[in-house]
């Protein structure tokens, strides 16, 4: 897809379907990589997408460097149904996401008339000046559609399958709400959690065997320290098929009963 022109965002709500819809998140910013700013967006986006039937498959964090951003945009947009980016659309010299996305798509960067109008209207209310820095925030790649929000006058944008959002969590969340009705969504991933009441090492082999016989189900084990300060495990079973989910859950519960009975005799 590198260097090709893509259509702008759809203008009507997308219907749900039974196919798998995937996404990646690209976090842009030196401040994240340096540790100065702690990311608060990845987990929110993951929960949001899961709830509407989109599988988040990959997350990358890149610095404010054009080659890194362009390469990541092209790699991720070609691999997944959607790419969501956060950060780098502010008024300063190091906010270069718009330029980089335009370069990735091989199109010009231009001031969007609606973005300029929104910015001027907000500044008229606040008494601010429409200066060069604020004009930077009205630039989008040619052909992009604005991603509006109720919090900030500065919009994000959507071009092809790339949705560019702010890094500020409250603004990002408002932008995500704005685009959600237009996203293609798939069948939701169902999930069940089972408390094992034994250590992960006690069930690892048996759990692996169950995973092999239930190949259409994702099975994960997550150790934790319980309220008695003992090593414990949560087993999480995930599938789009409720019957397959139930079958795997029953098999795991039966295995746990056997294992715990054996441990009690030891």
Protein language model annotation of sequence segments:
Residues 1-22:
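N-terminal amphipathic/basic leader segments beginning at the initiator methionine
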